Amino acid sequence: MSRKMAKFYKLDINRTEWEIPETYQNLQPVGQGAYGQVCKAVVRGTSTKVAIKKLARPFQSAVHAKRTYRELRLLKHMDHENVIGLLDVFHPGQPADSLDQFQQVYMVTHLMDADLNNIIRTQKLSDDHVQFLVYQILRGLKYIHSAGVIHRDLKPSNIAVNEDCELRILDFGLARPAESEMTGYVATRWYRAPEIMLNWMHYNQTADIWSVGCIMAELLTGRTLFPGTDHIHQLNLIMEVLGTPADEFMSRISSESARNYIRSLPVMPRRNFRDIFRGANPLAIDLLEKMLELDADKRITAEQALAHPYMEKYHDPTDEQTAALYDQSFEENELPVEKWREMVFSEVTAFKPTAAFAELLPKEQ
């Protein structure tokens, strides 16, 4: 929010001071994590609800500052119905165009009613529901992948849904390869492609498709498909379903310890997916088999999955947009915290809301 006339007010939320423009009213906390606190709010004079995230210590270190820059750049780049995007960004420092006063970053995004976790836990989904939800995930993924971005951490809690069953993918691309393990966060492992989880080999965008397969299986059955308690247990559960990998695939696993471990196990046959997903639509089972493919090079892509017969009811190639390529060259840079802060400041002050959201904002801003 580079609008210099904005009046800010302060309030205390869970022992954290928030300082936000009067544009945003009725703040209520909805979540808190290592990287920030999230509140829902109403745009003054409208019924529009938004989510506001206050980043925790955005410039505490060069690592924090680079993460802040990454999140802001990614959100700014994304403009798609099935992907969370940036509605507004602001900082309370005055004067607004002074880098010296720039210490806090607040990001405004769409407010969603629930995530897939809530939905899986509270209702039995029809096949049509599953089709529509998976279609939207794939439609959003096609867009994200076309930008050259890999999500890396797709799971039910990162997929938001509103009461009309409209879906958006959250928190994409924030886990870089170097920090992608998130030790101790069990639920992440359950949906993570084996090639990422076990550092088997170079991974590509189909790592996200594995995650969609795990999510789709859970939508169909109401149960987590591979609820591993650790990496080894996770791998065992996967092989109990998919069978022991072929020798040709094994030869491409770069981790010798992983190869030796798999070879030490009894040979496991592949289970029939029709037995695991009894009563499921045969087309759903066929798509699942193409998503839950151990070999990332043979795994179906988002674009191919959208054209699968299971998606026929919703598939419309003219309405499945692609994105401009996202410039990730900054990832190579190791810069001091002040330089990252300056770059974040430039992004914040240059931000322009979409025309639709700008219409809702007070005109003096």
Swiss-Prot record:
Subcellular location: Nucleus
GO molecular-function terms, A-Z: ATP binding; MAP kinase activity; protein serine kinase activity; protein serine/threonine kinase activity
Gene Ontology cellular-component annotations: cytoplasm; nucleus
Motif (TXY): 183-185
UniProt note on tissues of expression: At mid-embryogenesis, highest expression is seen in developing anterior and posterior midguts. Almost ubiquitous expression throughout all development.
Co-factor requirement: Mg(2+)
Pfam families found in the cross-reference section: Pkinase
Record keyword Nucleus present: yes
Active site, renumbered: 153
Homology family: Belongs to the protein kinase superfamily. CMGC Ser/Thr protein kinase family. MAP kinase subfamily.
Function of the molecule: Kinase involved in dpp signal transduction pathway in the process of wing morphogenesis when the levels of dpp are enhanced or inhibited. May down-regulate insect immunity gene expression after prolonged infection.
PANTHER family in the cross-refs: MITOGEN-ACTIVATED PROTEIN KINASE
Domain free text: The TXY motif contains the threonine and tyrosine residues whose phosphorylation activates the MAP kinases.
Protein name: Mitogen-activated protein kinase p38b
Name of the gene: p38b
